[in-house]
Amino acid sequence: MKVIVTENKIQGSAKAFEIFEKGIKNGAKVLGLATGSTPEILYQNWVKSDLNCDDLTSINLDEYVGLTPDNPQSYHYFMQKHLFDKKTFKKTYIPDGMTKDVPAYCKEYDQIIKDNPIDIQLLGIGQNGHIAFNEPGTPFDIGTHEVKLTENTIKANARFFDNEDEVPKSAICMGTANIMDSKKIVLMAFGEKKAKAIKEMIEGPITEEVPASILQKHPDVTVIVDTYAAQELDDKYKN
């Protein structure tokens, strides 16, 4: 893993965009994208840039089950608001949270990923080490699946809703196996609340109890953290 420690989220987001921009200019065509507060500034940089996205395909990590695309808390809505309304992509894929047959749809999404191998995958990380909605205990070999959200994840996402009861209880998400198939991975984390997860991901044992720890086995991972998220790391990663 390559670890880049920046002073703050703004610098970290700029560094992440540099990696995506360079990758795209060097031929990357399929991008795995993420949602949430972590990548917002990255997407702002993307929108302000002159980067042409006409030939790009994007595949998003996840979507809440039961939210329509026009629901302001859906990840469809998030992506439209922060990127797709301003930059035209050749094709965009986001899991369908309103599908009537979730298991069949998950197989379809796996096929989409197989047909469009991801060149660069963007990730965040949860305080418990989850990536996408792959919670602790999720098998490393799993593909796209429906996941019941943990109480902690529901609480963490409640800030985006009027109250905790409105947070969906499950989501469709790419599995760890899908993520590991990406050619390159860029993971961003900011703030001291992420420090423990970052340390366990990079320095801890590879275990399904820390889903992100599997990234130690990937050949091309760049981790971008601010000084707060890096504070528990061994000094050798802070240079």
UniProtKB/Swiss-Prot annotation:
Pfam families xrefs: Glucosamine_iso
Reaction(s) this enzyme catalyzes, per UniProt: alpha-D-glucosamine 6-phosphate + H2O = beta-D-fructose 6-phosphate + NH4(+)
EC number assigned by the record: 3.5.99.6
Enzyme class: hydrolase
Database matches in HAMAP family: GlcN6P_deamin
Gene Ontology biological process terms, A to Z: carbohydrate metabolic process; glucosamine catabolic process; N-acetylglucosamine catabolic process; N-acetylneuraminate catabolic process
Keyword Hydrolase applies: yes
Species assigned in the record: Lactobacillus acidophilus (strain ATCC 700396 / NCK56 / N2 / NCFM)
Keyword Magnesium: no
Keywords (A to Z) from UniProt: Carbohydrate metabolism, Hydrolase
Ranges in a coiled coil: none
Active site: 62, 128, 130, 135
Domain of life the protein comes from: Bacteria
PROSITE patterns, sorted: GLC_GALNAC_ISOMERASE
The name this protein goes by in its record: Glucosamine-6-phosphate deaminase
